[in-house]
Curated annotation (Swiss-Prot):
Alphabetized UniProt keyword annotations: Chloroplast, Plastid, Ribonucleoprotein, Ribosomal protein
Name of this protein: Large ribosomal subunit protein uL2c
Complex and partners: Part of the 50S ribosomal subunit.
Annotated organism of origin: Chara vulgaris
SMART domains linked to this entry: Ribosomal_L2 (SM01383), Ribosomal_L2_C (SM01382)
This protein's record includes keyword Chloroplast: yes
Gene name as annotated: rpl2
Length: 278
């Protein structure tokens, strides 16, 4: 896939670029694998804002994605490659030999008509799913389970890829896209290859309306508010925040403040911490 760059026909198309969607083969999703999706607009059951800057956006249908890949030993054929408005990666519709249809994440390089398999002895081919015990060192993987049978939880965003770097006993060392090296139980499943649509980060929205289509509302800077509304607010004209460090609207330190718990149970599985600012 490539990037389509608009000419400056209007102020909104100046500096605007989007994916060219050349590998998208189907416009309408499989009806049996979709369901309605109601936007909460950042509100809880009482109507109180619990997540700011959310609301509006285009209506969406939720596509049910098979992150578990539990069709063990049954071959599937890739029928379509589709756009999914609920994630930045694309998805594939797979028809299995037993007649069942399922959506999976689109692995980069897979084509319509390719055959995929989830099995203990599947070949190391893009789109196949195997336990970490069967995956050789240095292999690129995505959609990695943290607990056997729970479904892939790691490395699912567009263009992301992890790598198997070591094996010892019941554990496999995985280098994640953030640079973190983490131990994962060897019976967990992972899919071979890189997640598709790697050019996603190269797109330029070009206008504010593009964000509104996504259901994202404007973010007002704290320094532009009054002191009653934000710790950074107030002052005559354009001034500094007037604090030793940046704070959230509720007065907690932010931007550089570590938020991971020092006593989190999974800290023992982290061999090397992620890179700074990743």
């Amino acid at each position: 896939m490539g990037i389509r760059i608009y000419k400056a026909y209007t102020p909104g198309t100046r500096n605007r670029s989007v994916s060219d969607y050349k590998n998208i083969s189907c416009l309408k999703p499989e009806k049996s694998l979709t369901s309605g999706k109601m936007s909460k607009k950042g509100r809880n059951n009482q109507g109180i804002i619990t997540s700011r800057h959310r609301g509006g956006g285009h209506k969406r249908l939720y596509r049910k994605i098979d992150f578990r890949r539990k069709k063990i030993g049954i071959y599937g054929i890739v029928k379509t490659i589709e756009y999914d408005p609920n994630r930045n990666s694309h998805i594939c519709l797979v028809n299995y030999e037993d007649g069942e249809k399922r959506y999976i994440l689109y692995p980069r390089g897979i084509k319509i008509g390719d055959t995929i398999l989830s099995s203990m002895d599947a070949s190391i081919f893009v789109g196949n799913t195997l336990p970490l015990t069967q995956i050789p060192l240095g292999t690129a993987i995505h959609n990695i389970e943290l607990q056997p049978g729970k479904g892939g939880q790691l490395v699912r965003a567009a263009g992301t890829v992890a790598q198997v770097v070591a094996k010892e006993g019941k554990w496999t060392s995985i280098r994640l896209p953030s640079g973190e090296v983490r131990l994962i139980y060897q019976k967990c499943l992972a899919t071979i290859g890189q997640v598709g649509n790697p050019e996603f980060n190269n797109q330029s929205i070009g206008k504010a309306g593009s964000k509104r289509w996504q259901g994202k509302r404007p973010k007002v800077r704290g320094t532009a508010m009054n002191p009653v509304d934000h710790p950074h607010g107030g002052g005559e004209g354009r001034t500094s925040i007037g604090r030793k460090r940046p704070l959230t609207p509720w007065g907690y330190p932010t931007i550089g403040k570590k938020t991971r718990s020092k006593n989190k149970y999974s800290n023992i599985f982290v061999i090397r911490k992620r890179k700074l600012n990743s």
